Amino acid sequence: MDSWVVLLGLQIIWLPLLTHGTAPTPTLRFVAVGDWGGVPNAPFHTAREMANAKEIARTVQTMGADFIMSLGDNFYFTGVHDASDKRFQETFEDVFSDRALRNIPWYVLAGNHDHLGNVSAQIAYSKISKRWNFPSPYYRLRFKIPRTNITVAIFMLDTVMLCGNSDDFASQQPKMPRDLGVARTQLSWLKKQLAAAKEDYVLVAGHYPIWSIAEHGPTRCLVKNLRPLLATYGVTAYLCGHDHNLQYLQDENGVGYVLSGAGNFMDPSVRHQRKVPNGYLRFHYGSEDSLGGFTHVEISPKEMTIIYVEASGKSLFKTSLPRRPRP
């Protein structure tokens, strides 16, 4: 049986990979969706979240996915209270309930709205749900593409702990982190991990964007502290949400910036277009008439392909990034 290896802290777990039909090239595939967290009043979900869930299920059936990456703001507007909070059932389990999704693991990180509630409860829910994987505020995943020696590392961050909280519905920069020591510890951990990473693809994921032309714009804290690490250590891509639209940007070092924050709301704002360096923006979609969307990522021995999918089923944009050169 094909398998992948996942490293959560010091724990190594072997998990089965889905078989992708008769695909000629073995791949690792996943869906990345952010800001999908419904609403705090009945029915605890939105039409956009439901549409995204339906299209994610269809995409999993037709294109394949080994897991789903949640990019934060999992429960609007103030997170959850405890691990038995009904929002887990009403905003997550009951929405992403299609048969195609029942055995697909989710790897989760926290957004600013999650931090207005109890993030520890979201971590604890990992012991309750067979799908929900959130082992700690920040952690490492490692995958091996079946029948190859190609490896993928993903570093899941807590950017709220790094930079502080902010208002998701106002153009605010994050305030200072609540605990500077905790922020420095996470950044130091990431730096050491990236310096040691030998994988063929290295991805970093967090809630806040580094670059964005939309309502919140570039996150200055991350431009200062995280962006240099991506360039120095040859990171393939940074995935995020926070702004409620879909964007793809790429810098002069070849780092891709995948913004997928259209799981529950859509915002057409491009108010920070001039705050992003010329030539970085390759794609933006924020139509208020849209039901939102997400990204589908496929990693092969040759390249990483990213497709932006609207909840209606339409493919909006496709791009690819090369495998990192071997040392």
Swiss-Prot record:
Gene3D superfamilies: 3.60.21.10
Disulfide bonds: C163-C221
Upregulation: Induced by TNFSF11/RANKL-stimulation of bone marrow-derived macrophages.
Residues bearing attached sugar chains per UniProt: N118, N149
Tissue specificity field: Characteristic constituent of osteoclasts.
Subcellular location: Lysosome
EC code: 3.1.3.2
Catalytic reactions of this protein: a phosphate monoester + H2O = an alcohol + phosphate
GO biological process: bone morphogenesis; bone resorption; defense response to Gram-positive bacterium; negative regulation of inflammatory response; negative regulation of interleukin-1 beta production; negative regulation of interleukin-12 production; negative regulation of macrophage cytokine production; negative regulation of nitric oxide biosynthetic process
Cofactor comment text: Binds 2 iron ions per subunit.
Organism superkingdom: Eukaryota
Major localization listed first in the record, in broad terms: other
Binding-site list for Fe cation 2: D73, N112, H207, H242
A single MF term (Gene Ontology): ferric iron binding
Record text on subunit structure and interactions: Exists either as monomer or, after proteolytic processing, as a dimer of two chains linked by disulfide bond(s).
Signal peptide: 1-22
A GO CC term attached to the entry: lysosome
Known function: May play a role in the process of bone resorption. The osteoclastic trap acts on nucleotide tri- and diphosphates with higher affinity, compared with other substrates.
Cofactor: Fe cation
Protein name in UniProt: Tartrate-resistant acid phosphatase type 5
Keyword entries, A-Z: Disulfide bond, Glycoprotein, Hydrolase, Iron, Lysosome, Metal-binding, Signal
